[in-house]
A protein has these predicted regions:
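Nucleotidyl polymerases of mobile genetic elements and RNA viruses
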Residues: 1-197
Length: 197
């Protein structure tokens, strides 16, 4: 199964404290850490009846459009990725070596054996969410099963909170069909038409 997990307001939800601690654990220190700490320690004021109230700290959000934000988000997300890679209960496919996930922006493309692993995956994401602020948006997430077994498909469908994509799933602009022989028609031909327009 492939699960494309969409984050709920990915950049907006990351907790500053967790981000700074993660950077420190990864060996980022000195001037760079001080700059990040300063930029991501904003405060806000509310003006009520023309009177400025006491400032309060903003504790979450990596700034949209800020050049280091995608990198900072990826560094924070790597904590979850490492936990997934190291979790023995989460089974993965073998392509020369075990492949559990592929990360890009706020989507995690996760490839695994659903019957054994989905519960543990959701548990890890839930635990990570509590400390980092990262949450998944189930309506934005898709599961794609590479099986023609209807019984197995029904069982999996009942056990996961994601929408099931029946024929194909789109990842990084490429359509991944259920049948690999359709990959050329689904993606390559379509992309070539778009390029030649």
């Amino acid at each position: 199964m492939i699960i494309s997990i969409g984050a709920e307001k990915a950049f907006d939800k990351i907790q500053h404290t967790f981000m700074i601690k993660t950077l420190q654990k990864m060996g980022i220190e000195g001037t760079y850490l001080n700059i990040v700490n300063t930029v991501y320690k904003p405060t806000a004021n509310i003006i009520l009846n023309s009177e400025k109230l006491k400032a309060f700290p903003l504790t979450s959000e990596t700034r949209q459009g800020c050049p280091p934000s995608p990198l900072l988000f990826s560094i924070v997300l790597e904590v979850l990725a490492t936990a997934i890679r190291e979790e023995k209960e989460i089974k993965a496919i073998q392509i020369r070596k075990e492949v559990k996930l592929s990360l890009f922006a706020d989507d995690i493309l996760y490839i695994e054996n659903p019957k054994d692993s989905i519960r543990k995956l959701l548990e890890l994401i839930s635990e990570f969410s509590k400390v980092a602020g990262y949450k998944i948006k189930t309506e934005k997430s898709l599961a794609f099963l590479y099986t023609n077994n209807e019984k197995s498909e029904r069982e999996i469908n009942e056990s996961i909170p994601f929408t099931i994509a029946t024929k194909r799933i789109k990842y990084l602009g490429i359509l991944l069909p259920k049948e690999t022989k359709e990959l050329y028609t689904e993606s390559y031909k379509t992309l070539m038409k778009e390029i030649s327009i």
